[in-house]
Curated annotation (Swiss-Prot):
Belongs to the GCKR-like family. MurNAc-6-P etherase subfamily. SUPFAM superfamilies: SIS domain (SSF53697). Disulfide bonds: none annotated. It comes from Colwellia psychrerythraea (strain 34H / ATCC BAA-681). This is N-acetylmuramic acid 6-phosphate etherase. A lyase-type mechanism (elimination/hydration) is suggested for the cleavage of the lactyl ether bond of MurNAc 6-phosphate, with the formation of an alpha,beta-unsaturated aldehyde intermediate with (E)-stereochemistry, followed by the syn addition of water to give product. Pathway: Amino-sugar metabolism; 1,6-anhydro-N-acetylmuramate degradation; Amino-sugar metabolism; N-acetylmuramate degradation; Cell wall biogenesis; peptidoglycan recycling. The active site is at E91 (proton donor), E122.
Amino acid sequence: MNTQAKLVNELKNITTEGQNPNTLDIDLLDSLGVLKKINTEDQKVASIVGLLLPEISQGVDLIVDAFACGGRLIYIGAGTSGRLGVLDAVECPPTFSVSSEQVIGILAGGAGAMYKAVEGAEDNRQLAIDDLKAINLSSKDIVVGIAASGRTPYVISGMAFAREQGAKVIGVSCSANSSYAQNCDINICAVVGAEVLTGSTRMKSGTAQKLILNMLSTASMIRSGKSYQNLMIDVNASNKKLYARAVRIVMQATECDFDTAEMALAQANNQTKLASLMVLTGLDSTQAKAALASNKGFLRKAVEQQGC
């Protein structure tokens, strides 16, 4: 059997490549009918992800521990899966005021692959190793390998290399695959079933992966002190909208008025968490910085330490 025939045969056993019996007539429907089919399938995704909360929680714990030791969260994937990793990574600096080096998205084929497929990139095992070497992967880091099919050579190679370097590896897939599972410490496999359009894993599989990545990054940041109540207390006020959000967050966190919030932000160099602590406790910026540092950046703990 030649290589191509072998791959065709292999695809028969991949869940995401199956033909969905619920959408066999989709080409006969009007626009509303097509959308109803898509919506019905989409509604299955969140409940399936919900069954994986124990595994996702284990992943969060690994990431939190890594952050505490100076490690990074590194997503690696190809195609839609890789793009979703990049999307989650680039949102972390404005949302949580972390360095762009703390959460990294690696996409097979590089930055250009965000906009146009790079032929052969997902099949290139050495490329994944080179990409991880380029960011100086260390044993402190967490690598999340994302592949809907669970078979992408680029991703599996990256996961295997990461484990060889002593890094912990989390797998996020939508089809059970033994070689994939063997290369990760935590296997998060959301089997959402065959797609509305056969093999189009940008649909249910992509939605499931997005939900899981949202959980991994957001929960890890919350557990690292990046929220107060449910407020984005470390938002980076880097544009007019985010500055307005920062003002509003200070007002919500402290129940102060607009002028007080703006004054505190000015004194805190637009650091929302610092400004909030100053308003809540009456500390000046230097004292508030010290209080946050002694409480590892957790605003609630710093407030309680001051007896407020």
